[in-house]
UniProtKB/Swiss-Prot annotation:
Domain PRC barrel residue range list: 96-169
The species this protein was found in: Brucella anthropi (strain ATCC 49188 / DSM 6882 / CCUG 24695 / JCM 21032 / LMG 3331 / NBRC 15819 / NCTC 12168 / Alc 37)
Compartments in which it is found: Cytoplasm
Primary location group: cytoplasm
Family affiliation: Belongs to the RimM family.
Gene Ontology CC annotations of this record: cytoplasm; ribosome
Keywords on record: Chaperone, Cytoplasm, Ribosome biogenesis, rRNA processing
Name of the protein in question: Ribosome maturation factor RimM
Function: An accessory protein needed during the final step in the assembly of 30S ribosomal subunit, possibly for assembly of the head region. Essential for efficient processing of 16S rRNA. May be needed both before and after RbfA during the maturation of 16S rRNA. It has affinity for free ribosomal 30S subunits but not for 70S ribosomes.
Gene Ontology annotations of biological process type: ribosomal small subunit biogenesis; rRNA processing
Bilayer-crossing regions: none
Length: 189
């Protein structure tokens, strides 16, 4: 397979591990060891990497790539981002209410009346639950909870993410309908 047409970042190579060319790899897969199941991985320049071995090690996976046989070669890979093509992701294994994060980026956030709140620009998990970042030109990005109450429906075909403004914290319970990031701050005396 040539360089991915629709690249999805699967991992990033970290520091060398040992003297035989192994590297520490941070994966972005549900199962970190699944990195070995995707076949060839590619860097941003299109160079391919074949996983020969992968084993867990604390918060990363230790990987041995074909052709990387010593510590110097392994150290040269530090910081390399690894990609696959979007078509290689196992869509058939997802439940109806599961999505790949990459498929949510760029969706338009709208409420039931059709009011737009921006596009999904990022997803975060800071430990308290997933958050969606909504960006709108000329405005500061907003974070909303990625919960069923705040985001009751996702339609990939239409390219929309239905938001419930109150549950998402986009509208206060009082009459003020401005999002939290646009409210006026009290003047200092």
């Amino acid at each position: 397979m040539p360089r991915p047409e629709n690249p999805i970042q699967l991992a990033v190579i970290g520091a060398a591990h040992g003297t035989r060319g192994e590297v520490r790899v941070k994966t972005f897969t549900g199962d970190p060891l699944a990195i070995a199941e995707y076949g060839l991985l590619y860097d941003e320049q299109g160079k391919s990497y074949e996983v020969l071995e992968a084993r867990p090690a604390k918060t990363v996976v230790v990987v041995r790539f074909k052709g990387i046989n010593d510590r110097n070669a392994a150290e040269a890979l530090n910081g390399t981002e690894l990609f696959i093509d979007r078509s290689q992701l196992p869509d058939d294994e997802l439940d109806e209410d599961e999505f790949f994060q990459t498929d949510l980026i760029g969706l338009l956030a709208v409420d039931a009346e059709g009011k737009t709140y921006g596009v999904v620009s990022a997803l975060f998990d800071f430990g308290g639950g997933d958050l969606i970042e909504l960006s709108e030109k000329g405005k500061r990005p907003m974070l909303i909870p990625f919960t069923e109450a705040a985001v009751p429906e996702i339609d990939l075909d239409k390219g929309t993410l239905l938001v419930e403004p109150y549950a998402a914290g986009l509208i206060a319970d009082d009459e003020d309908e401005r999002p939290q990031n646009e409210k006026k701050k009290p003047k200092k005396s």
